[in-house]
Amino acid sequence: AGMVFRNNIDWLANQYNECRMGSSMFSYLLGYQDPRLSAYFEASPSAYAVAAFDGKNYQAVPPGNANQQNTIYTDFSKPNITSNTPTYWMRASEVYFLRAEAALRWGSEFGDAEALYEQGVATSFDENGISSSVDDYLASGLTPIAHNMRASYYSYNAAAPTTATPAFS
C-alpha cells in the first residue's frame, strides 16, 4: 500500500527526544551487571555519564521532567533502536515471564514457575544476541544499585529500588 514502516519508539527517542533510560532501569541494569544493557540502551556522550561494567558510559533521567522543549536530556542514554528495528507487541521472553507469574498465582497447572522464569531470562538473552551465561547471571547475587545522577543543572540521589537478585527465589 506504499506505507513505510518506522519504529515508533525510534520516532519518540530521536525525533521528539521523549524517550531515555530512567533511573530505576539504570539501577537494575548496572546493579545486576546485566549483559543486555548495551542491547537496550545506547551509550551517552554526556560529560556526566557513569562508566558501566561494559566499558561504556550511560546516563539516566531522574523521575519527572518539567522541560516542555525536551532539550535537557538529549545526550542521555536512549533506546538502542533505529527506524528499521522491528516493533514487537510481545516477545517470547515476556510470555515466559507471564506464565511464571500465573504459576505463582494460580498453581502448578500453569507450569513450574521457576523453570518458566529461567526460560524467560534465557529467551531474552537469545532475543538480544547475548552469549553470556544465563546460569552465571541468575546466580550472581547482585542487586540493583543506588546512584547519584547529576548534570550541570541538577543532582539527584536515586535509592536502589529493591534488594532482589536475578535469582528466582
Describe the predicted segments one by one.
Residues A1-R99, R105, F110-S169:
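Hydrophobic-face positions in mid-chain alpha helices that act as interaction patches
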